């Protein structure tokens, strides 16, 4: 059987695949960084033990960028052992992305179970200064919400007794003063009416779903690369025997 035309075809396909693979590495890296920067504040409030999915994606994406270039080099060199190493790496990437995808998908469904407790705890220990308190402020400002179900939840917090409702709840912070925020009746006209529970859980479920979907989609594409690399390695080895 003539193997050279098959080898040429497989090389072309694998080089194209390796380039696309490299692009997916850049995408994974970008999604991981985006997930950490965009969702980091929400994750710190939603879970007692935050998900590692963004970190897994960042690490995997960086590694893929490097090995995507290695895949192109191995294909051009036509080295069977390099191609086998490339296929082995693709299998490891497949497993890593599968773990990241499952982590994001499972965590997405745990959000509602943990948010009520952790966010309520954050409100009870709120002092307006520490990292967790600043995370609460960030959520309330960015989503224009207040409290868990609504602004009245703040009335049970120690902070309310001294300072009233936090200014981050205000629709317009320049129009809020401490006296208004101490009075729930007056505050009703000054602060956001929507609670953060529904808004945050919906936001997180949507965005963690994106992370999981990207990871799953790219993970299963590795199977194509593994097949191409193994086939090319086999045909190159067979061609070497034909030439002997």
Curated annotation (Swiss-Prot):
<dbReference type="Pfam" id="PF00335">
    <property type="entry name" value="Tetraspanin"/>
</dbReference>
<feature type="transmembrane region" description="Helical">
    <location>
        <begin position="52"/>
        <end position="70"/>
    </location>
</feature>
<feature type="glycosylation site" description="N-linked (GlcNAc...) asparagine">
    <location>
        <position position="150"/>
    </location>
</feature>
<keyword id="KW-0812">Transmembrane</keyword>
<feature type="glycosylation site" description="N-linked (GlcNAc...) asparagine">
    <location>
        <position position="172"/>
    </location>
</feature>
<dbReference type="InterPro" id="IPR000301">
    <property type="entry name" value="Tetraspanin_animals"/>
</dbReference>
<dbReference type="InterPro" id="IPR018499">
    <property type="entry name" value="Tetraspanin/Peripherin"/>
</dbReference>
<feature type="topological domain" description="Extracellular">
    <location>
        <begin position="108"/>
        <end position="208"/>
    </location>
</feature>
<feature type="glycosylation site" description="N-linked (GlcNAc...) asparagine">
    <location>
        <position position="183"/>
    </location>
</feature>
<keyword id="KW-1133">Transmembrane helix</keyword>
<dbReference type="InterPro" id="IPR008952">
    <property type="entry name" value="Tetraspanin_EC2_sf"/>
</dbReference>
<feature type="topological domain" description="Cytoplasmic">
    <location>
        <begin position="230"/>
        <end position="244"/>
    </location>
</feature>
<feature type="glycosylation site" description="N-linked (GlcNAc...) asparagine">
    <location>
        <position position="153"/>
    </location>
</feature>
<comment type="function">
    <text>May be involved in cell proliferation and cell motility.</text>
</comment>
<comment type="similarity">
    <text>Belongs to the tetraspanin (TM4SF) family.</text>
</comment>
<keyword id="KW-0472">Membrane</keyword>
<keyword id="KW-0325">Glycoprotein</keyword>
<protein>
    <recommendedName>
        <fullName>Tetraspanin-7</fullName>
    </recommendedName>
</protein>
<dbReference type="InterPro" id="IPR048232">
    <property type="entry name" value="TSN6/7_LEL"/>
</dbReference>
<feature type="transmembrane region" description="Helical">
    <location>
        <begin position="209"/>
        <end position="229"/>
    </location>
</feature>
<feature type="topological domain" description="Cytoplasmic">
    <location>
        <begin position="71"/>
        <end position="81"/>
    </location>
</feature>
<dbReference type="GO" id="GO:0005886">
    <property type="term" value="C:plasma membrane"/>
</dbReference>
<feature type="transmembrane region" description="Helical">
    <location>
        <begin position="12"/>
        <end position="35"/>
    </location>
</feature>
<feature type="transmembrane region" description="Helical">
    <location>
        <begin position="82"/>
        <end position="107"/>
    </location>
</feature>
<feature type="topological domain" description="Extracellular">
    <location>
        <begin position="36"/>
        <end position="51"/>
    </location>
</feature>
<dbReference type="InterPro" id="IPR018503">
    <property type="entry name" value="Tetraspanin_CS"/>
</dbReference>
<feature type="glycosylation site" description="N-linked (GlcNAc...) asparagine">
    <location>
        <position position="49"/>
    </location>
</feature>
<feature type="topological domain" description="Cytoplasmic">
    <location>
        <begin position="1"/>
        <end position="11"/>
    </location>
</feature>
């Amino acid at each position: 059987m003539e193997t050279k035309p098959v080898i040429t075809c497989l090389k072309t396909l694998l080089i194209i695949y390796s380039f696309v693979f490299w692009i997916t590495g850049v995408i994974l890296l970008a999604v991981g960084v985006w997930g950490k920067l965009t969702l980091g504040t929400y994750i710190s409030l939603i879970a007692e033990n935050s998900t590692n999915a963004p970190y897994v994606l960042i690490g995997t994406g960086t590694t893929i960028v490097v090995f995507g270039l290695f895949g192109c080099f191995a294909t051009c060199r036509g080295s069977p052992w390099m191609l086998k190493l490339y296929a082995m790496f693709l299998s490891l990437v497949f497993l890593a992305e599968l773990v990241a995808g499952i982590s994001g998908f499972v965590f997405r469904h745990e959000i509602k179970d943990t948010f009520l407790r952790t966010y309520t705890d954050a409100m009870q220990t709120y002092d307006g200064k520490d990292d967790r308190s600043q995370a609460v402020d960030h959520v309330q400002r960015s989503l224009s919400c207040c409290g868990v179900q609504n602004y009245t939840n703040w009335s049970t917090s120690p902070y309310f007794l001294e300072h009233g409702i936090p200014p981050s709840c205000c629709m317009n912070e320049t129009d809020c003063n401490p006296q208004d925020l101490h009075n729930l009746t007056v505050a009703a006209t000054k602060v956001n009416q929507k609670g953060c529970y529904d808004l945050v859980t919906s936001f997180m479920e949507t965005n963690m779903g994106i992370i999981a979907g990207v990871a799953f989609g790219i993970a299963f594409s590795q199977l194509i690369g593994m097949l191409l690399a193994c086939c090319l390695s086999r045909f190159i080895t067979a061609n070497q025997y034909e030439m002997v």
